[in-house]
Amino acid sequence: MRLRKALLLFVFTLFTLSNALGMTEDEAKSAIQEYFQSGHPEKAINLANQFKEKSPELKRLAFIAAVKAANTQYAGRFLPFKNPDAELNFYIGRYYEEMGNLTKAMDFYTSFQGDNMFAAPCYYQAGRCAERKDDFIKAEIYYDLALAAERTYKPAYAALARVKEQLGKKEEAEKVARGNYSTMARGEKNFAPPQVKPLKTLPANFKGKKSGQIVRACLAEKITSFNLTVNKTGEVFNINYEKGAILVYKQGKLIKGTTSPYRISNKDGIIKLTDIRTKSGPSGSLPTGSMFRGDLEIRIKDKALMLINHIDLEEYLYGVLPSEMFTEWHYEALKAQAVAARSYILLKMQSSTTAEYDVYVGKNTAYRGYNREKPQTTAAVDETFGIALFTPLGSPIDALFCTNSGGYTSSPATAWGSQNQGFLAPVPDKKVKANTTAPSPGQMAEFIKSPPPMYCYVAPYASYPSYRWCVQYSREELENLVDPQHTIGYIKGVQVNSRDISGRVTSFTVQGTLGVIVIGSRDIRAKLGGLKSSMFVCEYQLARNGLPNTFLFIGGGWGHGVGLCQTGAAGMAVSGIKFRDILKHYYPEAIIKDKCY
C-alpha cells in the first residue's frame, strides 16, 4: 500500500512538473489560487515547488499551501520569512498553532501593521490561542480588536461573549451575544467621513425652490398618542387614538374627533413631534423630537395611528440626502447622489402600490426630516433642482446605489434575481479595465487580494473594511449557517459554480458527506452569515484527516453593488470629475434631463 501511494505521488509530481515547465510565473500563481479555492493545496505545493527557488512569491505560496494541507513538517522548511505581510502572518500563526506553540502563534497573528483584509481573522485566532491558554483578559482584548477591525465578523461576537462570561461580565456578555456591542479597543472603522468642523442646521424659514410635486412619506404606524408643535404659531396639540377615533386636544380641550384622515397644515414652517407613544411603548421607530417640513396627515390603521408627511419633493430631498451620504463629502458626489435620490422618488411616486403613501421611512427611504438637514446637502439639492435620470422610454430610473462596489458594480439579476436594466448594467471602477467574460478563480483572487488603484478606495471616503474584508468560519460554524437541520452531513468541500461579469458569485455549492446544497445569487450573502457582498473567493484549510476544518471568505465591496458606488463617486469627485460624468458612468444608458417638472 505504501509503495502504491508513493508511486502515485511520484507520477502526480511528474505530471505537475511537465505542466509547470510550460507555465509563466503569473500563470502558476493563478493556478495555485485556483487550487486554494478548489480544496487541493497539495497540488498547489507541487506547482509552487517548481518556482520557489526563483520567485519569493511562489515560495510564499508554497508555504501557505503546506499549511492549508496540514503538512506542518514541509511548511517548517520555509521559515523564517523576511517582512511577512498580513496574509503570511496569518498562516505562520496557523503553523505555530498547529505545532502547539500558542505564544508564538499569537505573536505572528498580532504583528502586522496597518489596515488589511486579514486583520479580523488574525485577531480572532489570537483570541482563540489566548482562550486555550486560559488567558481570558488577553482573549477579550483580541476578540474586541477583531470586531474593531470588522464589525460584521460574527464568530467574534460569540467568542467575546464567552470570555466575558468567564471574566464575570455577565451584562456585557449578554449584550455581545445579541450583537449589541460597541467595540472600545480601536473604535468603529467601517466608515470614515472626513473630520471637519460641524455646521449649523439651516433656519426653519430657509426657502429653496419648490417642485410642486408632493411626496407622501409614511413616518410611522402603531402610534397611540403624541404631541405636535407648530413652530410658526407656537401651537401645541395632543393627539390620541381612543375608541376607534382620532382625538385632537389643544390646551387640554378637545377640538376635533374624527374617524376620517385628519391633516394639520404647515405652510413654510416646521412641525415637531414629541412624547410619542406606540402600542409597544415609547417612540418606536420614530424618535421623539423629530421635526418635519410640510403637512402631517393622521390616519387610523389597525386600531392605532399612521403618520404621513406631505412634503414638496425638493424639501423631501433636503431630509433624504444627509441620511444617504456623509454631508462633508465632496460637493460633486453630493450632487450626483441628489440626482439619484430625485430619480428614485419620482419613480416611487409613479409606481406607488398603496393609496396612503409613496414611501415608508426605514423600509424604502432614508428620509429623516428637518433634523438631518445640513447646508452642504441642501445646497446640492438646490443646485441640481429638477435634474433627474430617465430611461429612453421616458420613465424615471430606479437609481439604486451601494456603499462600496469593490471595484465593479453588479446587476439586479445577480442581487435579487430580477430583470436586468441597461441603466443598471455592471460597470468597472473608472480606473479598472472592463471584463469581457466572468473572471476565473485565479483572476478573481488577484483582483481581491492585490487590487489595482481604484476610485472606490480613496481616503478618507472609504474605510478598508468596506473595500476589502475576510471572514473565517470553522467547518461546524459553516454547517450551522447553511444547513442548520444537518441534512447533508459533514461539509467536505465548497465550490463556486458561476460568477457574473463583475466577479460576484451567482451560484455556490456546499458538498456534504450525505448530500449537496446549491445556493443561488439572491440567498448567498444571507446564507453565508451576512457577507458584506457576493464578490468573494472561498479558500479552505484541511485538517490532518483530509477534511476541511476552516473556510476563509475573502471579498470586496459592501452592499448589493448595484448602481452608483458612493465611495467611488466620492473618489471620482475629489479627482475633479463632475457629477454628470459620475452619473453617466454608473448609470450607463440613463438620460439626464435638466427639467423633470
Question: What residue ranges belong to the model's regions?
Answer:
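Bacterial N-terminal signal peptides that target proteins for export
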Residues: 1-8
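Bacterial N-terminal signal peptides
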Residues: 9-16
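Conserved, single-site charged/polar hotspot
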Residues: 21-49, 53-58, 64-86, 92-110, ...
